[in-house]
Amino acid sequence: MEIFAANWRLAAVAALFFVGIVSRRTGVASEKQGRALLAFVFNIGLPILIFGALAGVQLKREHALLPVAAICVSLAGWGAAAFVARRFGLPRIGEGAMVMCAMSLNNSMIYPFAALSLGAAAFSQLVAFDMGHALLVWTVTTVVACKYGGHADDIPVLLRRTLLAPPLWVLFISLALNLGGAPIPRKFLHAVLLVGQFAILAVPLAMGLLVSARGLRRPEVISAVALRSGFGVLVGLTLVWLFGLSGSGAAIAIIGSAAPIGFTAVVLSSREGLDLDLAASAAAISVFLGSLWIPLAMFFVPR
């Protein structure tokens, strides 16, 4: 029973995705509502989630290599996805969506299993890994999304779209409060985190409204899924060797590197006018597969 209680998010993701599909097919809602939901998540849901997750987490020096590993995984995914997309002959918006899929890690799917299975030390290592990814997503990845969205030649527009992104400002504010030792009540942060987790559930609902049967069968969609987890785990193994990681730190780096496609790939693809069908379809498949392999992977993390 504990495993089901700890993973209500996975059940909610599956249910909301199904509701989105049914709503679109019955004409209750359409792609327009799906894009509106993603705009809500980007401007409101994600900032709330980031503040609740990062403002109070303990930052330790011994975890310094794990954020670096997360950043390296995302950057390597960028290069690999750009190469594969060009082999497919995808247009700019298709290449951009594939890059978003490769750069965005859905570590939030790992948290429920980690909270149930791991000790405090290993769980804090997962948080450290995720912080590196969060920092990259709302800086470099956001700029990359703007670039593929057609703003690369207009530097003022590129900077404005990046610097005015609410998640970026909340990320900096959260880290500043954390490093400054601001006395924020734990109960308040926990409540904010719960609100953010509920708000982010609008993404699978939007994915259901946006995904298509044709999209799920596209070869570039399958390639995006393989890049995120298959190529990601190879990069993770390489980084473990290069950084000399061992024990739970090595396991967290490998599992985190293979994490499913993050919902931020769908959100940023929507914001910048990229191939949303590709991003939503790939994320849907990746999340489903992650729900199968992540629980098994937890057994290999040293306690």
Question: Would you name each region that the model predicts?
Answer:
Residues 1-303:
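Alpha-helical transmembrane segments of multi-pass small-molecule/ion transporters
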